[in-house]
Amino acid sequence: MDFYGRREQYGGYGGYGGGGALATPGYAPAAPYGMSQVNIEGNGCGRTLPPQPTVKVYCRANPNYAMTARNGAVVLAPANPKDEYQHWIKDMRWSTSIKDEEGYPAFALVNKATGQAIKHSLGQSHPVRLVPYNPEVMDESVLWTESRDVGNGFRCIRMVNNIYLNFDAFHGDKYHGGVRDGTDIVLWKWCEGDNQRWKIQPYY
């Protein structure tokens, strides 16, 4: 039985097969509507990310909730496209040079409202964190990858340097009452839950 109280049929590290392997800068002009221009001030760099579409991040457990930055944490909240804290930039600047062990490209998720990036947690069951983002510096601790499709276009979002720890809407599975306003995003091994299957979808 794991931390969630689920039994062995949820698979531990073997959800996709063997050993947990997934089977499965500069000035920029004003951004047009639907695009985001984020001033990144982390580490005093004061750089600006080029205008680019923002994305919504949500899990299959309840697509009516979206990932948001709240009080320095990353949680789920009722989806509201007018809430800039629910808008994220999927920064792919390192995607051609950094990939995970399965060859999937790395990206950072930067919050439009705060300019902070999602950083790896301290380990399994710990929440992910928000940190100042410097787009000029390659920081592996803020880089993530997506897995192959794990059903209906949803994918795992996992650490670039440890694909066995995935985004997990904590206790957002049906056995714990589902997603709620304020559900924490933690990292967890693959347990085949809908609260571990994510979409990163552009706002239109």
From Swiss-Prot:
Keyword Nucleotidyltransferase belongs to the record: no
GO molecular function, a single term: carbohydrate binding
Tissue: Expressed in shoots and lamina.
Domain Ricin B-type lectin: 54-200
Induction of synthesis: Induced by abscisic acid (ABA) and salt stress in shoots.
Keywords for the protein's UniProt record, in alphabetical order: Lectin
InterPro entries in the cross-refs: Ricin_B-like_lectin_EULS3-like, Ricin_B-like_lectins
PANTHER family named among the record's database cross-references: RICIN B-LIKE LECTIN EULS3, RICIN B-LIKE LECTIN R40G3
Domain comment, as recorded: The ricin B-type lectin domain binds glycan structures.
Its job: Lectin which binds carbohydrates in vitro. Interacts through its lectin domain with glycan structures containing specific motifs.
Name of this protein: Ricin B-like lectin R40G3
Organism, scientific name: Oryza sativa subsp. japonica (Rice)
